[in-house]
Amino acid sequence: MISKQASILPRRLIRRYHTNDPFEIAAALDITVMERSDFQRQKGAFKVVLHNSFIFINATMSNEMKRIVCAHELGHALLH
């Protein structure tokens, strides 16, 4: 069931927030995105701390890869 939701969710988010930028969508959903320079191999992570949602992204990646990872972590935030 998650795979069907995963294919529908991006279109719904783009329609609702009038953007395909995952950073803008995260901000609209009150999810804080932070870059981390201490990640070794890890590209990103989603965590909830004291009822606050965070996406952590490896600061050493290209901007294109950061967008991809942010979108991926948004999926974790919304589907799990």
Label each residue range with its predicted role.
Residues 1-80:
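Active-site hotspot residues in diverse enzymes, especially metal/ion-binding acidic/histidine motifs
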